[in-house]
């Protein structure tokens, strides 16, 4: 590695201890095509001296063939790994890179800028705490800038750094920078992004990325790296109530029965009264078990196994919550924003598999309430959602599930839709709220029969649809 830590050479155990105790920041870079996203990541790694010497040699060699800049080294090649990306000078897939500084660990997701790769960007943004939105100083706020900002807001990212890139091409003009800042802030009034920072940079030359530049003396703010190291993300989760989606029931012998999962929010202690949802059965936490031994407390992000004082029926897909805290919704129906990811359009009425925090259940899209144009943010009616389109949909499940709004808790408010024939992921969703369900008294006898039939199929033949059942009955008769 070009950068050698004295601590690594002197005391490897102390280095590992410090590294383990650093907090983690996940962020994405997004913006219009050729705004310099991959170059910026390469510059962050290069100027932080976090590139291996063999990597640097390989980039120098590849730059002679694929260089898209006037520099000796094209730093974008550190991230653009696919051959098609290098040949076209664009990003297609989401590329992840990992690095750390003295203050924090980072995971970067370099997302594609093209509209046809909206699903790729949604994937990268779904786990991020912060977004860097690049704007070309020569072009200003573009349609793709608005689209990416909308997706960032939709996916609950609360921190945005707007990096006005290529300032060297406009002679570091303060007027250009101020105009872009004001235009973006006017647009962002319609979005739910509470924390926005601006920084003028040149990713190609490294100005204001890791080190300050004297070329823009009018800018007295922090560098991009300083903002990344100091942004506060510990209070981002609005939900403080305990949520443990059960991923696995561990029963190695007759004397042990534990419920495994990663805590989505809140904290739990031995002795806490808990409720299993959707059944509503109550018990108390007997022990918090981990590989390193029992714990006196476990919090969000920790993978644990809980044992309970009572033998109650809990299965994979159920959710454990504390009895004295706010509970999630338990319902068969909710509204959610869906991002279409499959080649075939999403259509109301078709049976899909739904995966919510480890729970798999079948159901359907009851209605598409509206489709949102990600470029203009205008809503319009729609009968289907094609690849990369986003819409607000009403979902109806065949059995009840526990969930929160995505804004309150990502872990219990997100879902994916699965094609039941190919098992491919056809959409990702963010739950908005529980929708109004029809009461049983308001349903017709035929609708009640369909509900009970769906429940029986889900219980005994989970891969079979009503149409398949009807076809089999016709064949046998």
Swiss-Prot record:
Heterodimer composed of CysD, the smaller subunit, and CysN. Belongs to the TRAFAC class translation factor GTPase superfamily. Classic translation factor GTPase family. CysN/NodQ subfamily. Residues 202-204 are annotated as: G5. Pathway: Sulfur metabolism; hydrogen sulfide biosynthesis; sulfite from sulfate: step 1/3. Residues 165-168 are annotated as: G4. Gene3D superfamilies: P-loop containing nucleotide triphosphate hydrolases (3.40.50.300), Translation factors (2.40.30.10). It holds the Pfam family GTP_EFTU. With CysD forms the ATP sulfurylase (ATPS) that catalyzes the adenylation of sulfate producing adenosine 5'-phosphosulfate (APS) and diphosphate, the first enzymatic step in sulfur assimilation pathway. APS synthesis involves the formation of a high-energy phosphoric-sulfuric acid anhydride bond driven by GTP hydrolysis by CysN coupled to ATP hydrolysis by CysD. PROSITE patterns: G_TR_1 (PS00301), G_TR_2 (PS51722). It comes from Chromobacterium violaceum (strain ATCC 12472 / DSM 30191 / JCM 1249 / CCUG 213 / NBRC 12614 / NCIMB 9131 / NCTC 9757 / MK). One of its GO terms (biological process) is sulfate assimilation. GTP binds at residues 31-38, 110-114, 165-168. Residues 89-93 are annotated as: G2. It catalyses: sulfate + ATP + H(+) = adenosine 5'-phosphosulfate + diphosphate. It is an enzyme of class 2 (transferase). Residues 110-113 are annotated as: G3. Residues 22-239 form the tr-type G domain. The keyword Nucleotidyltransferase applies. One of its GO terms (molecular function) is GTP binding. This is Sulfate adenylyltransferase subunit 1. Keywords: ATP-binding, GTP-binding, Nucleotide-binding, Nucleotidyltransferase, Transferase. Its EC number is 2.7.7.4. Residues 31-38 are annotated as: G1.
């Amino acid at each position: 590695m070009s950068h050698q830590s004295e601590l690594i050479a002197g005391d490897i155990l102390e280095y590992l201890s410090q590294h383990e105790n650093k907090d983690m920041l996940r962020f994405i870079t997004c913006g219009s095509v050729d705004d310099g996203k991959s170059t910026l990541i390469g510059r962050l790694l290069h100027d932080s001296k976090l590139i291996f010497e063999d990597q640097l040699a390989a980039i120098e060699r590849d730059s002679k063939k694929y260089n898209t800049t006037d520099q000796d080294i094209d730093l974008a090649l550190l991230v653009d790994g696919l051959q098609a990306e290098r040949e076209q000078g664009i990003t297609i897939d989401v590329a992840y890179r990992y690095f750390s500084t003295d203050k924090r660990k980072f995971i970067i997701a370099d997302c594609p800028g093209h509209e046809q790769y909206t699903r790729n960007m949604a994937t990268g943004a779904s786990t991020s705490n912060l977004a860097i939105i690049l704007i070309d100083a020569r072009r200003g706020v573009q349609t793709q800038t608005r689209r990416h900002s909308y997706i960032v807001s939709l996916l609950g990212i609360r921190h945005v750094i707007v990096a006005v890139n290529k300032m060297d091409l406009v002679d570091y003009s303060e007027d250009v920078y101020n105009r872009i800042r004001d235009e973006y802030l006017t647009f962002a009034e319609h979005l739910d992004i509470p924390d926005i920072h601006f920084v003028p940079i040149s990713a190609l030359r490294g100005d204001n990325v890791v080190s300050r530049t004297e070329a823009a003396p009018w800018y007295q703010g922090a560098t991009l790296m300083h903002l990344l190291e100091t942004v506060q993300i510990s209070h981002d989760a609005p939900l403080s109530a305990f949520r443990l989606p059960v991923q696995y029931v561990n029963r190695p012998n007759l004397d042990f029965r534990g419920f495994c999962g990663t805590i989505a929010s809140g904290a739990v202690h031995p002795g806490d009264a808990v409720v299993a949802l959707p059944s509503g059965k109550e018990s108390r936490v007997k022990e918090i078990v981990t590989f390193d031994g029992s714990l006196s407390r476990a919090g969000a992000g920790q993978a644990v196994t809980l044992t309970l004082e009572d033998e109650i029926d809990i299965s994979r897909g159920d959710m454990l919550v504390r009895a004295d805290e706010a509970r999630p919704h338990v319902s068969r129906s909710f509204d959610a924003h869906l991002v279409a990811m499959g080649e075939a359009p999403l259509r109301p009425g078709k049976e899909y598999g739904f995966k919510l925090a480890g729970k798999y259940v079948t159901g359907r899209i009851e209605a598409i309430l509206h489709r949102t144009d990600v470029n203009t943010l205008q809503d319009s009616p729609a009968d289907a959602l094609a690849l990369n389109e986003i819409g607000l949909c009403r979902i109806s499940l065949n059995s009840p599930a526990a969930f929160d709004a995505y804004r309150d808790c990502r872990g219990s408010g997100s879902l994916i839709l699965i094609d039941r024939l190919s098992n491919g992921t056809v959409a990702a969703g963010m739950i908005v709220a529980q929708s109004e369900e029809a009461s049983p008294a308001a349903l017709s006898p035929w609708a009640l029969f369909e509900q009970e039939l769906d429940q029986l199929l889900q219980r005994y033949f989970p891969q079979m649809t009503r149409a398949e059942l009807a076809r089999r009955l016709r064949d046998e008769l």
